Amino acid sequence: MAAGCARTPKPQAPHPAATAKSSALRVLPLVPLPASLERHDGAFTITPKTTLSVASQDAAVQRSARQLAELVRRSTGITLASAPPGAAADGAISLRLDDQQKSLGAEGYELTIAPQSVSLTAATPAGLFYGVQTIRQLLPASSEYEAVLFQEPRPATLPALHIRDWPRFAWRGAMLDVARHFFSVEDVERYVDLLALHKMNRLHLHLADDQGWRIEIKKWPGLTTKGGQSEVGGTPGGFYTQAQFAGLVSYAADRFVTIVPEIDLPGHTNAALSSYPELNCNGVAPSPRFDTEVGYSSLCVDKDVTYTFIDDVVGEIAALTPGPYFHAGGDEVKTLTPEQYKKFIERVQTIVQAHGKQMIGWDEIAATSLHLSSIVQHWRPDAAKSEISRAPKLILSPADRAYIDMKYDDETALGLKWAALIPLKNAYEWNPATLVPGAAADAVLGVEAALWSETLANMRDVEFLAFPRLAAIAEVAWSPQERRDWDDFRARVGAQAPRWTALGVNFFRAPEIEWAR
């Protein structure tokens, strides 16, 4: 891939069932839908005379410009010549930071495509990056292939339009479970690339669970030398060294994706308990487990060594992640009393804050005394909404809408269905603002699609359950509620098929969608 997206798989032939009516081909293939869009007559044609003007030496802006130039080269065979900053000559594509665009927020942008020129402005490098992703979706899908597919330059057109765009929510996230099954650095980088394409900006990594511990902790090396060696089913696991994890954090940051590390505490900890028996109340290491049962494990909350362990783990991971968050889990703890659980979470909250991070936890932590900076991630459809509504900050991941490891239907080979069957329409048609009655409007930070990996052995499995539902969640998180429409989304997501195919994405061809060739 280009500068904003690392690698492009080899081209794949379109699925033989992929068809599209002419109405689907006429839509603008933009997902998520921009906040404001006006179509105009005409189009801008990219030719060998087209130039690229970049009015900033900011490193992130330059990366976005290189990505755009590479996408143009792949889709047309044309190498854009550089033009002086601010050049307004016919045939110019210009990228410019503009303080007057601050009204669009930290991630907004304005894009004007006219027959004579293309202008992209934003107040921040992030805004320009997201504007480039919009242009990317308007370019031919051949821009996603790693090699130019033709010998002679082939002009391409961009439809004339005017877009002013900004996200509805600041938190537009995805969670990837690398604990039940391990995914390599390259796999996770690919997922980052796909998130960035769809303007998502958080990747929550579930780094430890009963079946495996996936990040090196130098003060507790047995966590990975023993606890990181397997996964669900007993197949070989793996882990990230601290250098690898730091590299992943940097890779994501270049694409305006913040990595949110999670170490689930005090439950979901059998991999840690089997590595260090002193973390158990009886001092005996349990056998490693590779099944998918939950709720049976817990750190010994009455031992001082437990909190030394947590402080060391949080400290080492916090040093690797410049983002402000640390996810401490807190879910499905069935072996503690409510009072034990409450005291534990509040003590962990203090540790996390001491390392300069905001604590995030699954919605069970709403029953404890939380600091105003702490964040509750709502996931249980049957959770007490009155309790959740009092949370100082909320991330919404309702399992019956946003758990994209659920099956699409009863025939889906992968995934689970304990929360619900989630066809694409169900992932799309919900309003975060009304999900938790009584929650303050400013308490809802945004939305996160969770992908647990009990049934997923490789990235093709991940992509099959993620797409197209991840695109639906991206639009729920970005686009204004009043602009969203299922039938309109059906046409636009169907138009993504050539791009996803070029990227090698193993997406589910939902039967309710007319997939473009």
Label each region the model flagged:
Residues 369-372, 380-517:
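Flexible, acidic glycine-rich loops studded with aromatic residues
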Residues 102-297, 305-307, 313-325, 347, ...:
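Feature activates predominantly on carbohydrate-active enzymes
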Residues 55, 177, 205-208, 260-268, ...:
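Generic beta-strand/beta-sheet core signal
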Residues 7-10, 14-169, 461, 473-513:
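Contiguous, structured surface segment used for ligand recognition
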Residues 305-315, 319-389:
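Gly/Pro-rich turn-and-neighbor structural signature
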Residues 2-4:
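C-terminal motif of bacterial Sec signal peptides marking the signal peptidase cleavage site
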Residues 60-61, 182-184, 210-216, 266-272, ...:
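Flexible loop/turn segments at secondary-structure boundaries
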